[in-house]
Amino acid sequence: MRLTDAISIRSRRRKLALFLDEMRPAEATTVLDVGVDEVSLGEGGGQSGCTTHNFLEERYPWPERLTALGLHDGTRFRERYPRIAYVQGDACSLPFPDASFDVVHSNAVIEHVGGRERQAAFVDEALRVGRRVFLTTPNRWFPVEVHTRLPLVHWLPESLAGRAYDVVGKSWARDNHLLGPADFRSLFPGAVEIRNLGLTLVAIT
């Protein structure tokens, strides 16, 4: 296992432990996981190199109470996780009625949905369909950018960072919109607790 994958898995274990401790789900708790991937834990990581996809789906004790939402058609996801309901849809326009779930969970998705307007819509939708939310995102002020594995480049102005990504063959990183603690908090219209775990920020309502 690569060191970066080991760090990622450790981070996700920490977030899962925090999720279980803060949300205290029980067997009857309904959970929506927004932004799942078609590939599963340990499979190829695509552009980001990440091999820790769908960590909640792999570890959650009551999969029958999970609903997963993703952009893909879900064929491989359903094969891998037959006990979990899968819905294809847009995280910024969720196809569910108000208060459909006890908890909305999303791990490191909000930085991929677009700029601040789309990110605000993402938060609004999570708050609309969930009685509580648990959202995570990489911390912009951590010195290593988790998607590219590059140090400090993401602290540059976006135009300069974009050029640097182009030079090293990571132009796809231009589409990542990272958040610092104040940025993350500003997306919530009401009370929210922002936990700074160093590498990761967690928003809890």
Please tell me what each predicted stretch does:
Residues 132-159:
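Conserved class I S-adenosyl-L-methionine
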Residues 168-190:
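Short alpha-helix
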Residues 1-27:
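Class I SAM-dependent methyltransferase Rossmann-like catalytic core
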Residues 12-17, 47-54, 178-181:
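Well-ordered, non-membrane alpha-helical segments in soluble/globular domains
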Residues 2-6, 107-117, 170-175:
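Surface-exposed cleft-lining segments at the edges of enzyme active sites
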Residues 204-205:
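Active-site beta-strand termini and strand-to-loop segments that position acidic
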Residues 29-142:
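Conserved SAM-binding loop
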Residues 190-201:
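Conserved S-adenosyl-L-methionine
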